[in-house]
Amino acid sequence: MVPSRFVFVSSLSIFGAIREEPYPYEPIRETDIPRPNTAYGESKWQAEQFLATVKDFPYVILRPTGVYGPRERDYYIMAKSIKQHVDFAVGYKPQDITFVYVSDVVQAVYKAMKAEAAVSHAYFLSDGQVYNSRAFSDLLQKELGNPWVLHIKAPLWFLRLVCAISGTVNGWLGKLTTLNLDKYHILSQRNWQCDIEPARRDLGYEPQVLLDEGVRRSVQWYKQEGWL
């Protein structure tokens, strides 16, 4: 049975590190050629390509940037680190980051199920803003009561070395680790800008939660659930 609409949540990560020269960077657009540099991005890209081969199948693809909010663990690790007085960053080249709060992704999924113009198309999702590499950690620090924080910035080669060692050792031990070469590629990417105007036009998508409010809600949830 063919569904009336299939919404696939892909990722901005399918594009890898593109449009990183010159600075200021240009937003990644749907017309750009995907160049995934992680297993996660490659899997999403392969799924997108498969959907495009299915005949008479009404699909819509959503490509959110970094999704955060209640229950999300990667950004929780950052919050936990800041509570413990350490903020670790890598790379000295400017980094433009984008985010989307989880409820805005839900909004987009719902709208994609209804919008006829969206069938067989792919759309980026973010909150429509671009942030520097300190924005998220500074907001976390504020919501955690402004604890003193030691800001450490390491060169990319150091991150790559740590991720390579961690990934190799944990692979030998049969353990999963978030510090691997895929994580290196994600953290080292400098340009996470994306163009959400097509989503606004075709889906009627409009971000409701900007970063300051989203971080406030996230930290509140982490505290309520005993994560922080």
Feature-to-residue mapping (PLM):
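Flexible, glycine-rich beta-alpha linker
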Residues: F15, F57-I77
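A short C-terminal helix-loop "cap" of Rossmann-like NAD(P)-dependent dehydrogenase/epimerase domains
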Residues: P27-I33, A79-V90, N146, K175-L179, ...
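Conserved C-terminal active-site "lid" loop/helix of NAD(P)H-dependent oxidoreductases
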Residues: V102, D138, C163-G171, K175-E206
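Active-site Tyr-X1-5-Lys
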Residues: A17, R35-L62
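Amphipathic terminal alpha-helices
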Residues: C194-D202, E206-L228
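Mid/C-terminal beta-alpha module of Rossmann-like enzyme folds, strongest
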Residues: K111-T178, D212, R216-R217
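Substrate-positioning beta->alpha
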Residues: E42, Q46-A47, E72-I77, G91-M113, ...
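Conserved Rossmann-fold NAD(P)-dependent oxidoreductase catalytic core, especially the SDR/UDP-sugar
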Residues: M1-A39
